[in-house]
């Protein structure tokens, strides 16, 4: 009887990548494994996918270092770039690809390149890790997300300066959709047009704008590289499941019934007595709570799966437990498995009941949850 287990199917993960390849057959795949591979496990995900993809994308330098230190020698892109001088030097020494999204990053790169030219044979550089250069730069253009990226009219200036920098090997272009999960969205079409115009004279260079939603719904924007993220894990980037497209859920979150109780009509349940049964019933207590990362704000009626049937959460989720209404005729027993989400209870359904996105559910599981890889 094990509480709070996240079972990760490597087979499902590989299956989903093969499906993505069919959706983008001519493109290279940069698998996004940021945020602990969307909560699925950074290093297990990298090991499972290494022979199927053309590189990995991460958001933090330490993620790139962890993957490379396993012996992986392929492309690793820092999708937010380097945050300071120390990170830039480490990026150079390890040969990571990096995004440039602002003037400050460009100026720091130019400054380090100038120092290298002057001091490359002196002790200044002998005190650093050996530099492997040049590195590949991905110039990020803000086409409408308005989060990171240079303005489209700055592309020529940034390109010229990067082209003249001795620490730059190749220059690619990327952007990010803000509403790609909305089908037939004029704003997304506008972003594509902006990206096209900004990179028109650089069409010989690699380009990328399509992440998960772009892969699914905007094939005209696949360009040379696509960046699958949450869909690798069989999860939709919105509330509509993608299992009908052939994707398989990678994670099953499960736990155990640790108590079964007869409950009288009119009696409250849980902290604050927020739920009161209108009839006699049987309650089950599940070893899963917000201490495991299950949302405390999950409302009454949020579904869980026990013995092949959906039952609702009742009362407030507590730190270590939650309570479900098994029904008066329940035949369930202590020790029975409880599925919080997985193949037969999709995470999109749970997320919609709670009023969050699936991304939050999978990335907020705590270290108390046991991860098993199969």
Swiss-Prot record:
Gene of this entry: alr
HAMAP family for this protein: Ala_racemase
NCBIfam families reported in the protein's UniProt record: alr (TIGR00492)
Family annotation (InterPro entries): Ala_racemase, Ala_racemase/Decarboxylase_C, Ala_racemase_C, Ala_racemase_N, PLP-binding_barrel
Entry function: Catalyzes the interconversion of L-alanine and D-alanine. May also act on other amino acids.
Transmembrane segments: none
Protein name listed in UniProt: Alanine racemase
Gene Ontology terms: cellular component: cytosol
Catalytic activity: L-alanine = D-alanine
UniProt keyword annotation of Isomerase present: yes
Biological processes per GO annotation: D-alanine biosynthetic process
Lineage summary: Bacteria, Pseudomonadati, Pseudomonadota, Gammaproteobacteria, Pasteurellales
Enzyme Commission identifier(s): 5.1.1.1
Record: active site: 34, 271
Cofactor: pyridoxal 5'-phosphate
Family membership noted in the UniProt record: Belongs to the alanine racemase family.
Name of one Pfam family that matches: Ala_racemase_N
Involved pathway(s): Amino-acid biosynthesis; D-alanine biosynthesis; D-alanine from L-alanine: step 1/1
Superkingdom as given in the UniProt entry: Bacteria
Keywords, in A-Z order: Isomerase, Pyridoxal phosphate
MF GO annotations: alanine racemase activity; pyridoxal phosphate binding
């Amino acid at each position: 009887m094990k509480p709070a287990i996240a079972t990760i199917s490597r087979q499902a993960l590989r299956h989903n990548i093969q499906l993505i390849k069919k959706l983008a057959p001519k493109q290279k795949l940069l698998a996004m494994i940021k945020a602990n591979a969307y909560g699925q496990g950074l290093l297990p995900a990298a090991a499972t996918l290494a022979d199927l993809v053309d590189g990995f994308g991460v958001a933090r330098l330490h993620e790139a270092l962890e993957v490379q230190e396993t012996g992986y020698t392929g492309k690793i892109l820092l999708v937010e770039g380097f945050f300071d001088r120390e990170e830039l030097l480490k990026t150079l020494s390890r040969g990571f690809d990096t995004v440039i999204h602002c003037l400050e990053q460009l100026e720091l790169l130019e400054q380090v390149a100038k120092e290298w030219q002057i001091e490359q044979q002196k002790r200044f550089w002998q005190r650093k890790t050996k530099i492997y250069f040049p590195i590949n730069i991905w110039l990020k253009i803000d086409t409408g997300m308005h989060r990171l990226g240079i303005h489209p009219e700055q592309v020529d200036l940034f390109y010229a300066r990067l082209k003249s920098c001795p620490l730059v090997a190749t220059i690619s272009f990327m952007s990010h959709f803000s509403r790609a999960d909305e089908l037939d969205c004029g704003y997304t079409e506008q972003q594509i047009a902006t990206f096209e115009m900004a990179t028109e004279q650089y069409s010989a260079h690699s380009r990328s704008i399509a992440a998960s939603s772009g892969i699914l719904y905007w094939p005209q924007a696949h360009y040379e590289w696509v960046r699958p993220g949450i869909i690798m894990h069989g999860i939709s980037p919105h509330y509509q499941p993608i299992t009908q497209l052939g994707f398989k859920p990678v994670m099953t979150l499960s736990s155990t019934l640790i108590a079964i109780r007869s409950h009288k009509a009119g009696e409250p349940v849980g902290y604050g007595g927020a739920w009161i049964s209108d009839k006699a019933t049987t309650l089950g207590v599940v070893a899963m709570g917000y201490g495991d990362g299950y949302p405390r704000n999950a409302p009454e009626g949020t579904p869980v799966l026990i013995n092949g049937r959906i039952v609702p959460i009742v009362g407030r989720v507590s730190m270590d437990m939650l309570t479900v209404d098994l029904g008066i005729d329940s035949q369930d027993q202590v020790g029975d498995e409880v599925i919080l989400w997985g193949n037969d209870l999709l995470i999109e359904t749970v997320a919609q009941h709670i009023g969050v996105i699936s991304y939050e559910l999978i990335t907020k599981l705590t270290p108390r949850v046991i991860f098993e890889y199969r």
